[in-house]
């Protein structure tokens, strides 16, 4: 009969390696040795996560402020300044996250050399998932600002109709919006129309807001285009990563349940042993008593 012990051992080694890979995908920050490269890596990951959460909060604040300004015919300068400050903070946080992601990105040479390393794949996983979260948040911010721009344009269009300036077509309106200066935009409106001072002020304010908004959108686009492209190329890989993380988390959870069950079974086995020992002791005592009584009798 052929000795297959070596093959079985190889199978066990392969299974152990798969288990290690699964666990590596869901390694929790703080489990690495203090001062080790992994601990430093996870410290950076925690920092990025915290910054992404902070960015998300700022995006929510921006959305609320935009809704408030849209509901105000003539928003105060302080409101517009607060909105611009939020945009600046979002851009600054975006730059910070981009640099932080760059710092944990596995170098190509290192990744190629250690492609099958569990540690390398874990780092690529963390970088990929964080990058995707970042890009999704920025896409949400850009979409939100684009929608805000359209609502401002609609407010201008509505004001023009109210003031009998309805002859301005959508194309002409876009051309005037692209003029780059509020004064030029307003003078173009005044050429052939009679506009009230209040309506004129609102139109001018909306136009200035649109200009600032467009600059913000362009700057965000310039900052994050390369990262969005990279994440799009890695989209399938990131989806696999998320699937692996979920399955790995289930795997670890099942493992914890198995350990818990094993401990409970172990406790039950110990209790059974104690009960058996007690029963045996009682039986021995009874036999001794019976034998003693018989001998005396």
Swiss-Prot record:
Keyword RNA-binding: no
Protein's membrane topology: Single-pass type IV membrane protein
Annotated transmembrane regions: 276-296
UniProt entry keywords in alphabetical sequence: Cell membrane, Cell projection, Coiled coil, Deafness, Hearing, Membrane, Neurotransmitter transport, Non-syndromic deafness, Phosphoprotein, Transmembrane, Transmembrane helix, Transport
Site-annotated residues for Required for neurite tip localization: 290
Residues recorded with modification Phosphoserine: 14-15, 36, 117, 208, 248
Chief location category: membrane
Tissue: Expressed in neutrophils and neutrophil-differentiated HL-60 cells. Expression in neutrophils increases with differentiation.
Complex and partners: Component of the SNARE complex composed of STX4, SNAP23 and VAMP7 that interacts with SYT7 during lysosomal exocytosis. Found in a complex with VAMP8 and SNAP23. Detected in a complex with SNAP23 and STXBP4. Interacts with VAMP2. Interacts with SNAP23 and SNAPIN. Interacts with LLGL1. Interacts (via C-terminus) with CENPF. Interacts with DOC2B. Interacts with STXBP6. Interacts with STXBP3; excludes interaction with DOC2B and SNAP25. Interacts with STXBP4; excludes interaction with VAMP2. Interacts with STXBP5L.
Disease: Deafness, autosomal recessive, 123: A form of non-syndromic deafness characterized by bilateral, severe to profound sensorineural hearing loss with onset in the first decade of life. Sensorineural hearing loss results from damage to the neural receptors of the inner ear, the nerve pathways to the brain, or the area of the brain that receives sound information.
Protein name: Syntaxin-4
Organism in which the protein naturally occurs: Homo sapiens (Human)
Gene, per the UniProt record: STX4
């Amino acid at each position: 009969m052929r000795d297959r012990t070596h093959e079985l051992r190889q199978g066990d080694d392969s299974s152990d390696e798969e288990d290690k890979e699964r666990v590596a995908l869901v390694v929790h920050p703080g489990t690495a040795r203090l001062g080790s490269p992994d601990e430093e890596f996870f410290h950076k990951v925690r920092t990025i996560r915290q910054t992404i959460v902070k960015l998300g909060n700022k995006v929510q604040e921006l959305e609320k402020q935009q809704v408030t300004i849209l509901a105000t015919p003539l928003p105060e300068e302080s409101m517009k300044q607060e909105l611009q400050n939020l945009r600046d903070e979002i851009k600054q946080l975006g730059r910070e996250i981009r640099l932080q992601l760059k710092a944990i990105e596995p170098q190509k040479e290192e990744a190629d050399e250690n492609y099958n390393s569990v540690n390398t794949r874990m780092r690529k996983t963390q970088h990929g998932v964080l990058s995707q979260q970042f890009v999704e948040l920025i896409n949400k911010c850009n979409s939100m600002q684009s929608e805000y721009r359209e609502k401002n344009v609609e407010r201008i269009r509505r004001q023009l109709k109210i003031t009998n300036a309805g002859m301005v077509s959508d194309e002409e309106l876009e051309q005037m919006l692209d003029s780059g200066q509020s004064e030029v935009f307003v003078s173009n409106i005044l050429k052939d129309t009679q506009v009230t001072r209040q309506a004129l002020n609102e139109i001018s304010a909306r136009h200035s807001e649109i200009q600032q908004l467009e600059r913000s959108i362009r700057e965000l686009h310039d900052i994050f285009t390369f990262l969005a492209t990279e994440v799009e190329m890695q989209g399938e890989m990131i989806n696999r990563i998320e699937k692996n993380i979920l399955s790995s988390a289930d795997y670890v959870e099942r493992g914890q349940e198995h350990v818990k069950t094993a401990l409970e079974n172990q406790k039950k086995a110990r209790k059974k042993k104690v009960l058996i020992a007690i029963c045996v002791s009682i039986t021995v005592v009874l036999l001794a008593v019976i034998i003693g009584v018989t001998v005396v009798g």
